[in-house]
Every structure is written in C-alpha cells, then in structure tokens.
Amino acid sequence: MLSSLQNPRQAAAQLMNFGLILSTAFMMWKGLSVITDSPSPIVVVLSGSMEPAFQRGDLLLLWNRNLISETNVGEIVVYNVKGKDIPIVHRIVRKFGVGPDAKLLTKGDNNAADDTELYARGQDYLNRKDIVGSVVGYMPFVGYVTIMLSEHPWLKTVMLGIMGLVVVLQRE
C-alpha cells in the first residue's frame, strides 16, 4: 500500500494526476463562465427567501446572454451587491425604463418587503450590470454539499484528506 510512495516516479505521476483533475475542473468552470457570459454560472441557494420556488441547497444554473431580450419583471435573477461577496437570488418585481439603463427592483418570494434594504448604501435600484445571470434551470438539494462545507469547516479538511489518500493509494 505505502510501497508506491517509495518509487519517486510513481509518486510524481500520482501528484500530476491529481493536478490534472484540478486543472480540468478549473478549465470546465472557466469554459462554462465564457459560454454563459456569467462570472458565476452555477450558484447555490443559501437561504429560504425564494421558497417555494427554490429551497435552501438547490443548485441554480445561470445564463447571462440576453443579447436580444431584456431582463423582465417576473424573471428570477442572481445579483451582486457592492461591498458584499455573496450573490443574492431574487425575483424582479418592478422595472423602470428600458434597455441597458433600466432600473430593476427585486424581492424574495418568501420575503415581506422588497430588497432596497439589501442594496448598497445610497442604491435604490439595481442596474443591468449588477445582474450576474438569470436562472434557467436548477437541481434540487445538490448544493447542500457546499452549505455543509461552509457551515462545518472541519469537513473541508476531512474531504481533502480523503481525496489525498485516494490519490496516494490509487493503483494503476
């Protein structure tokens, strides 16, 4: 089992194999970002603000290539707020104006009030450039792994350790 560590070539090959897996995952993520024109083409719902449409832990697929159509009222979008690094998933409830200069107001389906309190200080509406993408699909509860890893940091260490052991103990 540990004899494979004694051969430096085999250990280097296993290390390169692990690097190949990581770089392939990174390239797939970046490719998906280019195709969808979204810096974050896949996001996880972190709260219950969009219930019953989406549950906590749902994995959302985003699309940001609205070349012909505009962002419309009723559309579920993911947006970033200046100064905060967690994207928010909510529905557009009002739209003022047309084209790239339109102002958008959002609200969670399960929230009592609109999102003006969530926006950056001095910001009353979202601009089109604040939108990360529109939701085009979802996979229920698949994102719960991400939530578990962020809520239990020790779980990251355990998973990385298991992945490392699999790579080291892998037989060819």
Swiss-Prot record:
Alphabetized GO MF terms: serine-type endopeptidase activity
Highest taxon above the source species: Eukaryota
Membrane-topology annotation of the record: Single-pass type II membrane protein
Residue ranges, annotated region (C-terminal short (CTS) helix): 158-169
Topological domains, Lumenal: 36-172
Record note on domains: The C-terminal short (CTS) helix is essential for catalytic activity. It may be accommodated as a transmembrane helix in the thinned membrane environment of the complex, similarly to the signal peptide in the complex substrates.
Cellular-component GO terms for this entry: signal peptidase complex
Subunit field text: Component of the signal peptidase complex (SPC) composed of a catalytic subunit SEC11 and three accessory subunits SPC1, SPC2 and SPC3. The complex induces a local thinning of the ER membrane which is used to measure the length of the signal peptide (SP) h-region of protein substrates. This ensures the selectivity of the complex towards h-regions shorter than 18-20 amino acids. SPC associates with the translocon complex.
Task performed by this protein: Catalytic component of the signal peptidase complex (SPC) which catalyzes the cleavage of N-terminal signal sequences from nascent proteins as they are translocated into the lumen of the endoplasmic reticulum. Specifically cleaves N-terminal signal peptides that contain a hydrophobic alpha-helix (h-region) shorter than 18-20 amino acids.
CDD domains to which the protein is assigned, alphabetical: S26_SPase_I
Regions that span the bilayer: 15-35
InterPro entries: LexA/Signal_pep-like_sf (IPR036286), Pept_S26A_signal_pept_1_Ser-AS (IPR019756), Peptidase_S26 (IPR019533), Peptidase_S26B (IPR001733)
EC class (word): hydrolase
Lineage of source species: Eukaryota, Fungi, Dikarya, Ascomycota, Pezizomycotina
EC number(s) from the headed UniProt entry: 3.4.21.89
Organism: Chaetomium globosum (strain ATCC 6205 / CBS 148.51 / DSM 1962 / NBRC 6347 / NRRL 1970)
UniProt GO BP: protein targeting to ER; signal peptide processing
Catalyzed reactions per annotation: Cleavage of hydrophobic, N-terminal signal or leader sequences from secreted and periplasmic proteins
Parts of the chain on the Cytoplasmic side: 1-14
Designated name of the protein: Signal peptidase complex catalytic subunit SEC11
